[in-house]
Amino acid sequence: MLYENIKKLVEYGIQTGLTPECEKIYTTNLLLELFQEDSYEDVEIDSSSIELEAVLEGLLDEAVKRGIIEDSIGFRDLFDTKIMNCLVPRPAQVQKTFAEKYEESPEAATEYFYKLSQDSNYIRRYRVKKDMKWKVDSPYGKIDITINLSKPEKDPKAIAAARNAKNTAYPKCLLCMENEGYAGRLDHPARENHRIIPIEIAGGKWGFQYSPYVYLSLIHI
């Protein structure tokens, strides 16, 4: 199953445009290294309908089985982010593509970046679908009510491990530029698959990014 899921994930990367076809072998080898696997067999897969959630679930179960990670949501989220980073273009390439798309139109650039943020699993679409949203009337007009279920609660193992972890002030905050590519900790989300677009506003240097939790449609920071 490991070889099958690795091949499916690489194919997912190619289909979504995260991974160029010419990097298929390179990406496969990156994934094999994560699983401490020295060999590989090119197995047959059905590439017509690859479900990212199912593929990642299978890979995470394999990582638990091999003793690479503990079986808790905290460790699984850290590791599947590391897995996805094997598919995602480096920041310079993302910035270059964004700039090229911007020459076409700002809409083309932001649509590209939002799609990448979803395809890379930075925005976890299968969790966002679980969010509950509805509208209610009020004296001031309609109010949007949202119950965010896409941000998972920490399990007891993660809480205990975080309590014993070494304190650090890096990154400075959850939205700071230092998060791009950060491996994460049990008390700080992994952002290895995260990309930020540098922009200049009124002479100041800023970073454009989307929220991974989609409190509102296309919410960005």
Model-based region annotation:
Residues 1-175:
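Extreme N-terminal flexible tails
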Residues 113-126, 174-207:
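Extended, Lys/Arg-enriched charged tracts that mediate electrostatic binding to polyanionic substrates
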Residues 139-140, 201-204, 215-216:
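Short, well-ordered loop/turn elements at secondary-structure boundaries
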Residues 144, 207-209:
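Structured core elements
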Residues 149-151, 210-214:
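Short, flexible loop/turn elements at secondary-structure junctions
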Residues 219-221:
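Conserved small/polar residues in nucleotide/adenosyl-binding loops
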